[in-house]
UniProtKB/Swiss-Prot annotation:
Entry keyword Chaperone: yes
Name of the molecule in the record: Co-chaperonin GroES
SMART domains attached to this UniProt entry: Cpn10
GO cellular component: cytoplasm
Keywords: Chaperone, Cytoplasm
Subunit structure: Heptamer of 7 subunits arranged in a ring. Interacts with the chaperonin GroEL.
Family: Belongs to the GroES chaperonin family.
GO terms under biological process: chaperone cofactor-dependent protein refolding
Length: 96
């Protein structure tokens, strides 16, 4: 199943959580926090303004992003957990 987001929505795959702390302690699955970083896997066509024009999104497929802990709606597609969120829920793009 493929999810094609509408308007200013973005589909994000969470990046894997770090399972060790900085001091080397291994965290069990329940203790590890869900990461607040992900990779954009699909983007909508853009937000429609009051004048009817469409503003393209600033993020694109493949971008690594940072988002809020409670951002987006969790959905499952082909057994994979994804997030669907608005572009305004994204804090920034991680650049290398």
């Amino acid at each position: 199943m493929t999810i094609r987001p509408l308007h200013d929505r973005v589909v994000v795959k969470r990046l894997e959580a770090e399972e060790k702390t900085a001091s080397g302690i291994v965290l069990p699955g329940a203790a590890a926090e869900k990461p607040d970083m992900g990779e954009v896997i699909a983007v909508g066509a853009g937000k429609i303004g009051k004048d009817g024009s469409r503003r393209p999104l600033d993020v694109k497929v493949g971008d690594k992003i940072i988002f809020g802990k409670y951002s987006g709606q969790t959905v499952k597609a082909d057994g994979e957990e994804l997030l669907v969120m608005r572009e305004e829920d994204i804090f920034g793009i991680v650049e290398k």
